[in-house]
């Protein structure tokens, strides 16, 4: 399964390993096994584990300006050791610090970090689930045309079976703000700026409790 990761998440190798290079001043040549396999090549800067590719691209923004972007593609069938993790950040941190803390917590080696949500004044406005625990819920209300409305947002997550799912999500008030999946954005259409005047509930037709192990979400659904 190939996944184009478009959110703030980590792809991490499930096993921790230390790679080191040792040398000495000895003139004695290393012993070579005549029938043994060729040694693995030394890791190079920027190398990623098997199954993970990162492609850099640029795009012209006009006016002599360019943007620099990256596309990360993970093939979990090619490398089952790759893992998708959502990381909750109550405080702002650099990717380097996130990677270091991820490793120090013995969670593996972080390979790619991507922003996957919205925030305002230091507070998350997006759904985030990690280890099956809901750490942040999506912004349940917004103001449009001086009215309070209830947008249903999209989310991307991995289930306990390993399967990935995308759903329209709302954390319902009548079931402790747990995330529920809906078959559509319901009566919300951001293209026409029309929204629901009342929040969906666990009893809304098509509602189903959603229990991912890792998930992020908060905006409109672009690809499914």
Task: Name each model feature, range by range.
Residues 1-9:
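Bacterial N-terminal signal peptides that target proteins for export
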Residues 10-16:
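Sec-dependent N-terminal signal peptides of Gram-positive bacterial secreted proteins and lipoproteins
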Residues 17-21:
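C-terminal motif of bacterial Sec signal peptides marking the signal peptidase cleavage site
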Residues 24-25:
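Short hydrophobic helical membrane-anchoring segments positioned at the boundary
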Residues 29-174:
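Zymogen propeptides
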Residues 31, 36-45, 181, 185, ...:
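Intrinsically disordered, low-complexity segments enriched in proline/serine/threonine
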Residues 144, 148-217, 223:
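A substrate-binding/cap region within the structured catalytic cores of diverse enzymes
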């Amino acid at each position: 399964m190939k996944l184009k990761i478009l959110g703030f998440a980590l792809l991490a190798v499930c096993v921790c390993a230390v790679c080191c290079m040792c040398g000495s001043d000895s003139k004695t040549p290393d012993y070579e096994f005549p029938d043994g396999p060729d040694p693995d090549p030394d890791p190079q800067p920027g190398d990623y584990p098997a199954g993970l590719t990162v492609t850099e691209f640029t795009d012209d923004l006009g006016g002599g300006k360019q943007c620099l972007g990256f596309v990360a593609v993970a093939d979990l069938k090619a490398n089952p050791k790759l893992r998708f993790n959502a990381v909750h950040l109550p405080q702002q941190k650099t990717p380097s610090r996130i990677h270091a803390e991820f490793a120090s917590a013995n969670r593996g080696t972080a390979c790619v970090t991507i922003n996957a949500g919205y925030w305002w004044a230091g507070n998350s406005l997006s759904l985030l689930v990690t280890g099956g625990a809901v750490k942040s819920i999506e912004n349940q209300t917004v103001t449009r045309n001086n009215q309070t409305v209830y947008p249903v947002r999209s989310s991307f997550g991995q289930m306990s079976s390993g399967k990935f799912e995308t759903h329209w999500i709302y954390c319902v008030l009548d079931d402790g703000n747990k995330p529920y999946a809906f078959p559509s954005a319901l009566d919300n259409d951001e293209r026409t700026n029309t929204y629901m005047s009342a929040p969906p509930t666990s009893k809304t037709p098509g509602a189903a409790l959603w229990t991912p192990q890792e998930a992020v979400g908060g905006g409109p659904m672009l690809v499914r």
